[in-house]
From Swiss-Prot:
Major site of localization recorded for this protein: cytoplasm
Binding-site positions, substrate: S54, D141, N153
Record carries keyword Lipid metabolism: no
Family membership: Belongs to the glutamate 5-kinase family.
Gene expressing this chain: proB
Protein name: Glutamate 5-kinase
One Gene Ontology cellular component annotation held by this UniProt entry: cytosol
Keywords, in A-Z order: Amino-acid biosynthesis, ATP-binding, Cytoplasm, Kinase, Nucleotide-binding, Proline biosynthesis, Transferase
Organism lineage: Bacteria, Pseudomonadati, Pseudomonadota, Gammaproteobacteria, Pseudomonadales
GO molecular function: ATP binding; glutamate 5-kinase activity; RNA binding
Organism: Pseudomonas syringae pv. syringae (strain B728a)
Matching InterPro entries: AceGlu_kinase-like_sf, Asp/Glu/Uridylate_kinase, G5K_ProB, Glu/AcGlu_kinase, Glu_5kinase, Glu_5kinase/COase_Synthase, Glutamate_5-kinase_CS, PUA
Length: 372
C-alpha cells in the first residue's frame, strides 16, 4: 500500500505550528530551512507540491510578547495579521536560496463554498503548480468569523487536497502517527501503520486536543484524512521530527499512519461538494430513502423524507441522516426549509398541488449529492 505514497505525483504538505516555532518564541528559521531542503528535493524528484503552513498566529504572538493563545477572535486576528507577514517572508527567502518561487494564498470557507470562487481558486493553484511555484496556503484569519472558519489547518489542508486533486496529503505533527492507545500514558501503545480512513475503530483512539499554539489534535487530523479521502487522496499522519521524513516517505519507508480512501477520485462537481463544511439544515430520511441513496445512489425524493430541521434556502447544503441519526449524505437542496416542510412525505407529482409550482421533482438531485 505504500506504493500509493511513492507513486504520488501531487502532494499537499501541512506543517503545524509546533514544528515551525522555537518553543513558541517566534519562527524557527533553521527548522524552516530544513523543511525547504526536503521540499526542494521532492520538487527535483518530480513531485508537484502545495504547502499549507501554520504558524502565523504563533509568530504574531511572539512579536506581541503574548505567551498564551488568546480566545477572543479580534486578538487572534490581530496576531495572525502580524505573524502572516513574517511567516510568508521566511518561506519566500528560504525557498529563494534554492531558486524556487513561492506564492501566498489566503483562503476562507466562503472561497470554497461558492462554486465560481472555488473554480477560480482551483485554476490559480493549478497554474502555480504547473509553473513549478510552491503555493504557501493559510486561512485568511483576519476576515473570518466563527461561522465561516475552517477551524484548523488540518481541515484546510484536506480541502486544499480536494481543490488541487492531490494524490497525497501529508500531515506533519509532533507525534509519530496514530496509535492504538495514548503513548503518553501507555508504554505498550502500538503505531497504526495503515488503515482505511473511514474505519470507525479509529475514532476511539483519536482522542486529545491541540497544543497551546495550535488548534488541531489527532481527532482533527483523522477528520481531515476522511475529508481528503472523499476526493480520492491518501493521507499520511507522521512525526515532523523524524529526520528526512519527506524523503523517506517518498522512498517507501513505513513511517507514520497511512489512511486510505474507500473510493477513487470523485467527479469535479462532487469534489466541490465534498469541500462544503457549513450545513444549514438536516433532512431525516426513512429506510427506503436511505437505501436509495446509499445503495443505489439515486436522487432524494420528497416522499422519502420524514422530518426537516433547521433553516435553509434553495441551493444551500443540508445533511441527510437516517432515523437513528447516522449521517448518510450531504447535498444542495432544491427547496427552502419552508417549502420542504410542505412537500415531504408526498410524491413528486404532488409538489405542484402543495406549493403551486415545482422547481424540481427531486428534493436533492443525485448530481448535487455526496455520500459520506
Amino acid at each position: 500500500m505504500r506504493s500509493k505514497v511513492t507513486g504520488a505525483q501531487r502532494w499537499v504538505v501541512k506543517i503545524g505550528s509546533a514544528l515551525l516555532t522555537a518553543d513558541g518564541k517566534g519562527l524557527d528559521r533553521n527548522a524552516m530551512g530544513v523543511w525547504v531542503e526536503q521540499m526542494v528535493a521532492l520538487h527535483e524528484a518530480g513531485v508537484e507540491l502545495v504547502l499549507v503552513s501554520s504558524g502565523a498566529v504563533a509568530a504574531g504572538m511572539s512579536r506581541l510578547g503574548w505567551t498564551a493563545r488568546p480566545s477572543a477572535m479580534h486578538e487572534l486576528q490581530a496576531a495572525a495579521a502580524i505573524g502572516q507577514m513574517g511567516l510568508v517572508q521566511a518561506w519566500e527567502s528560504s525557498f529563494a536560496e534554492h531558486g524556487r518561487h513561492t506564492a501566498q494564498i489566503l483562503l476562507t470557507h466562503d472561497d470554497l463554498s461558492d462554486r465560481k470562487r472555488y473554480l477560480n481558486a482551483r485554476s490559480t493553484l493549478r497554474t502555480l503548480v504547473e509553473l513549478g511555484v510552491v503555493p504557501v496556503i493559510n486561512e485568511n484569519d483576519t476576515v473570518v468569523t466563527d461561522e465561516i472558519r475552517f477551524g484548523d489547518n488540518d481541515t484546510l489542508a484536506a480541502l486544499v487536497a480536494n481543490l488541487v486533486e492531490a494524490d497525497l496529503l501529508v500531515i506533519l505533527t509532533d507525534r509519530d502517527g496514530m496509535f492504538d492507545a495514548d503513548p503518553r500514558n501507555n508504554p505498550e501503545a502500538q503505531l497504526i501503520y495503515e488503515a482505511r480512513a473511514d474505519d470507525p475503530a479509529l475514532d476511539a483512539v483519536a482522542g486529545g486536543t491541540g497544543g497551546a499554539l495550535g488548534r488541531g489534535g489527532m481527532q482533527t487530523k483523522l477528520r481531515a484524512a476522511r475529508l481528503a479521502a472523499r476526493s480520492g487522496a491518501h493521507t499520511v499522519i507522521v512525526g515532523g521530527r523524524i529526520e528526512r521524513v519527506l524523503a523517506r516517505l517518498k522512498g517507501g519507508e513505513r513511517l507514520g499512519t497511512l489512511l486510505s480512501p474507500e473510493r477513487g477520485m470523485l467527479a469535479a462537481r462532487k469534489q466541490w461538494l465534498a469541500g462544503h463544511l457549513q450545513t444549514r439544515g438536516t433532512l431525516v430520511l426513512d429506510d427506503g430513502a436511505v437505501a436509495a441513496l446509499a445503495r443505489d445512489q439515486k436522487s432524494l425524493l420528497p416522499v422519502g423524507v420524514k422530518l426537516v430541521q433547521g433553516s435553509f434556502r434553495r441551493g444551500e447544503m443540508v445533511v441527510c441522516v437516517a432515523q437513528d441519526g447516522r449521517e448518510i449524505a450531504r447535498g444542495l437542496s432544491n427547496y427552502s426549509a419552508i417549502e420542504a416542510q410542505k412537500i415531504i412525505g408526498h410524491s413528486s407529482e404532488s409538489i405542484v398541488r402543495e406549493l403551486g409550482y415545482m422547481a424540481e421533482p427531486e428534493l436533492i438531485h443525485r448530481d448535487n449529492l455526496i455520500l459520506v
